Amino acid sequence: MTTDLHVLSAEEVWEVIDKYGKAAKRTKAAGFDGIELHGASGYLPHQFLSDTSNLRDDDFGGTPHKRTRFMIEVLKCLIDAWGDSHRIGVKISPGILYNGSVENEVEETYTALISQLNELDLAYVAFQTPESLRSLAGQDNDDIAGGEIWHRFPYEFIRENYNGTVIASGDLTKELAQNALDAGKADLFVFGRAYMSNPDLVERMQNDWPLTEVDMRRGYGGGEEGYNDYPTWQEQQAQQQQGPVG
């Protein structure tokens, strides 16, 4: 059975928001410590923020401020369901081109969004950069080569506008993260793919051991290979000392 595609009515939008709250209650009952709303990378909350995907002309679209309403109402619903705003965070990705997302009014929209996020007193705001730092590193750019990436959007934009804890992500290296931290442009940093292929990532960074590159061909599906079988540094050294098998 299929249903014809249609624009959500305002009533249906509120029903979706309510489902977030119900999910939050189940999450808390299951014993989780908190919730991060994924408002980035072209997913539903991000689609409401974008002027190219959100063509509504009601309370949930038509202006930068109205386009922020869905995400803000979802966050309020999560806070109400959990009972503690410090257990709720949100991830955003201003200007990112991912999963078909395109935004033409980035600063106007995210200025309106962040001013409201300040009022919610969340645990944190996490962001993903709109450009791949790994790709940027291949360009002739002295700042990138020197490990300074924090001056690129949206590091300073978010730091200047958001009053709480800021978490940065996006193809980071230890050097890039440390320099951004030293510059005061973020408080915490996310290493997602690096952790997939380096179960001992913290120890590797502490000891300046080289990192194992992740095989993204297995990053989003497939069998069990590449899921949790990457060796630690110590295991790699032991394997090399043993030599080839057979």
Where are these regions (language model features)?
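Flavin-dependent oxidoreductase catalytic cores
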Residues: 1-246
